[in-house]
Amino acid sequence: MSKTMKVLVGIPGSGKTTLRNQLVAAGAVYTNMDELRQAHQAVLKKEGRNKFEKFVAQKEQEDLKRLLSEGHEVVVVDDTHLTLKGIEHHERLAKDYGYVAEVVFLEDSFNFAMCHKRNTSRPVDQHVPVYVVEEMAERFLKVHFQYHTRDVVVKKDRQKAIVVDMDGTLAHMVSRGPFEWHRVGEDTLDEVVYELVKFYKSTGHTVLVTSARDGVCYEQTKEWLDRHAVPYDMLIMKPENDSRKDVIVKMELYVKYIHQKYDVKVAIDDRLQVCKLWRALDMKCLQVNHGLY
């Protein structure tokens, strides 16, 4: 069995420590910069913040190289890793020591509200300020995208496009429940969003209807779009029986079906988490409802 170095990627409150502790209980060893900061507070008081951070980073690398050279089966790097450069550095280091690097993205990082709640439930001296967590959440979205598209060759002449959501954006539930997929044909059309879609279509944009609806209602959704004469070019939905969060699914669909071929000029959505995703990917995003769910 190959020796593994697990590179954890996630924001505060995303479950990195929980996962690390599970791995350690199974025999892994680890490094963690926060613990090194706590252990070397005397250096901070003596040298100041900038020199202290450099010291901690160097100390972690020394500890990590020592653990790798000792030949442990599983070595965990328990840090946020919110830059592609940092992730790739540890991938190279793992290879140098004969390890297989496994980059683990903590999916709870997509759920800022949950991470914020966990963060504030910690002892006061361990709180990360909310504005810092928000900034880290945006960086997580960026690095997740960069990592999963680093080998993608983007077409030079990508077609300009818009991405538009279904539920709560182009379509609205009237009497059905949110998971009554067999009744999506009963939804009403949002006339304002409809006019926006028609405008962008008339100006030469490809219209990509991108929905986190369960794939079981793909045909019903197509029928609804056709019945309401929505001028779309492609309907992209998640697979059947996929219960993951909208923001995770939208990221995956964008990477798989859109990024390489289309230059998205505008995204239209209602859910705040998804709008934050589009903005983190440097798209103009029109948020058409509060979407705090």
Stretches found by the model and what they are:
Residues 3-9, 100, 107-160, 274-276:
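Conserved GTP-binding G-domain of TRAFAC-class P-loop NTPases and closely related GTPase folds
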Residues 17-73, 114-116, 174:
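Conserved substrate/cofactor phosphate-moiety recognition/catalytic segment
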Residues 215-263:
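Substrate-recognition "cap/lid" segment bordering the active-site pocket of phosphatases
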Residues 254, 262-293:
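Acidic, Mg2+-coordinating phosphoryl-transfer loop and its flanking beta/alpha structural elements
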Residues 39-43, 81-125:
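ATP-dependent NMP and nucleoside kinases share a basic, alpha-helical "lid"
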